[in-house]
Amino acid sequence: MGTTPTTATAIEVAGLDCGYEGRAVLKNISFTVARGEIFFIIGGSGCGKSTLLRTLIGIQKPMAGQVSFSGQSFSEKDPAMRVKLLKTFGVLYQGGALWSSLTLRQNVSLPLEEYTRLTHIEIEEIAALKLAQVGLTGFGDYYPAEISGGMRKRAGLARALALDPAIVFLDEPSAGLDPITSRRLDELVLQIREMFGTTIVVVSHELASIFGIADRVIMLDQGEQGIIAQGAPRELAKTSRDARVTEFLQRGDLLPQ
């Protein structure tokens, strides 16, 4: 898939239990993500993909275990380190999470205003650059309601890239998009990895994206409350002896040859 990931570790998850209201949804989750890797978290509805993502980015506190970024533990016990680490990754939420009352340029500017001491002119220049990097040159003064769903996803991605993060998390980026628009977004994700060496973690159930751009995946299962498979998706589809894995990856007409 383009740039070869390095052997250096960008994310390490060890013995993670996560859930809500005192109930564990996932138990003993352990995996690593290499720098520059496009890594997918996959599985059926209700398996805990979004719960795991929220725990990785710090929205939810883990019930047990540890998440580390480049060897540094992401812990609420160290607020200064937590803020430092928050600056090293960007997030594209499922709906794009753009403020409807702000233009695209203003939306992309928000992280820069929050986390940097750049001047207004510098922030404007960076926001325009990030919009250009996702193919939205000339759309800075548009509001989210004035553009298509695919363009809103691109604008959300531009905001996620505003601080030049080492890691970007994408939550169901293809949701609500037609197949052509979804494929174009996949191509953009590949371009971002190629240009910047960004580590990209994607929550998805879309087979076209899984087979199209993922270097490796972990598959979650609701019944197991954990990981039931991990590896390259094409290899898993061909060689896994777990019916849950093959049934998920061999849906539709996208079985890899």
Language-model segments: which ranges?
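Helix-to-loop junction immediately C-terminal to a conserved catalytic motif
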Residues: 57
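Conserved ABC transporter NBD signature motif
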Residues: 65-74
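ABC ATPase NBD coupling module
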Residues: 74-90, 120, 236-240
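Conserved ABC ATPase signature
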Residues: 143-147, 151
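Conserved ABC ATPase "signature" region
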Residues: 120-139
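A short, proline-enriched helix->beta-strand linker immediately N-terminal to the Walker B motif
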Residues: 162-166
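Catalytic Walker B motif of ABC-type/P-loop ATPase nucleotide-binding domains
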Residues: 168-171
